[in-house]
């Protein structure tokens, strides 16, 4: 048979199979825009602003709708009530992790973030318990964050009140906290290995926000067959994991099971305890994946929030002044802030919550997946279907937060100036898959920001009227625009 005829027949078969698969699946799933064969809804989605496309779809198809990434259906949940019903009311059924092609290549299903089933449950439980009880009478996590806050202040003093881009310095602080917990020690901000680690995290974070990654997730074939920034991403991940493996080997050579020094030691001891269990999830590769996840979850997300937060405080000097007034009243100038102070600082607490709400760091959340066939809002969602919870629709709900596009700490204050909680505050997601590093992130944001404002006044290089606070990207992560700032010692 003529090769051309064979090619045409093969392509026709693929096209017909795609049409059959999509049409048969769509009968059960929530409604949504009509997908094209093979490529799905990619042409109807603005990969530079996915959230805007999804919000527009919700106006047409309702709060539960389906889009296709290539040939794969993805169910999107819009609005607080829908997200709550899924992640909280049906927590177990929606507790799976939706694995997109890029994340699958990065993690191989290991660690905390992208694992599922028994591996996820055991690794997450162990990690949370270890971090919560870390030190067993030695230095607490709070001690480590306070130490890093003091080191951060000293680094900021070295700028001598000159204009600077705070990206690098603010990236060092949360990364060093993770290093302290995982590797036993913090690094000097000039250490070459530390600088390399920071650079890789920063580059990878920016690549992950790019439209190209969204295209790769729609067409996985591109990952192996085409050049692009995804190759730089995967190379950086491989180099980082290689560095972690070296650290693990160093720990193995000096391990004292009666005196664990850090997270790696605790994991190695757990491995030894389960060495006779052939089904154990505590392996070297899972340790490497888990440590990598701790850096991913605990470094760039926190540093980006800090960087965006300082930009907002620059833009709103009246807010900054009130926070500093509260710092003077509750803490003073002669001791370091501690977590006990937070309950006595309602305005500062409200400001930090508003920063997280306003910047909407992960607008689409990290993908979930249903762990079983489930009937949800009269639709049948098959086991394994990827679920996207549109967190931006919760954090920017105009009924809960009047004028949601405006930065206003009053969103979290009652009429008496007391801190006011909101069920709509979901920057860390919700349910069983809520961010494992939530407690650490909240601690770092409070201690780093209060320590900075205790020691410095903030000065903008640009005129405040021209200071842009609109996110530079609106993909899976919101990044602030670049800016210059002066840290003026008080």
UniProtKB/Swiss-Prot annotation:
Q: Does the keyword Heme apply?
A: yes
GO MF terms, alphabetically ordered: heme binding; iron ion binding; oxidoreductase activity, acting on paired donors, with incorporation or reduction of molecular oxygen, reduced flavin or flavoprotein as one donor, and incorporation of one atom of oxygen
Biological source species:
Macaca fascicularis
Entry binding sites for heme: 435
Q: What class of enzyme is it?
A: oxidoreductase
Broad class of where this protein is predominantly found = endoplasmic reticulum
User: Reaction catalysed?
Assistant: an organic molecule + reduced [NADPH--hemoprotein reductase] + O2 = an alcohol + oxidized [NADPH--hemoprotein reductase] + H2O + H(+)
Required cofactor names:
heme
Give the induction note.
By 3-methylcholanthrene (3MC).
Give the family per the record: Belongs to the cytochrome P450 family.
Report keywords, A-Z.
Answer: Endoplasmic reticulum, Heme, Iron, Membrane, Metal-binding, Microsome, Monooxygenase, Oxidoreductase
Q: What is its EC number?
A: 1.14.14.1
Q: Where in the cell is it found?
A: Endoplasmic reticulum membrane; Microsome membrane
Cross-referenced Pfam families: p450
Is Heme tagged as a keyword?
yes
Q: Name one GO cellular component term.
A: endoplasmic reticulum membrane
Cross-referenced InterPro entries, in alphabetical order?
Cyt_P450, Cyt_P450_CS, Cyt_P450_E_grp-I, Cyt_P450_sf, Cytochrome_P450_fam2
Question: Which GO biological-process labels does this protein carry?
Answer: organic acid metabolic process; xenobiotic metabolic process
User: What function does this protein fulfil?
Assistant: Cytochromes P450 are a group of heme-thiolate monooxygenases. In liver microsomes, this enzyme is involved in an NADPH-dependent electron transport pathway. It oxidizes a variety of structurally unrelated compounds, including steroids, fatty acids, and xenobiotics.
Q: How does it sit in the membrane?
A: Peripheral membrane protein
Protein name, per record: Cytochrome P450 2C20
Report the gene name: CYP2C20
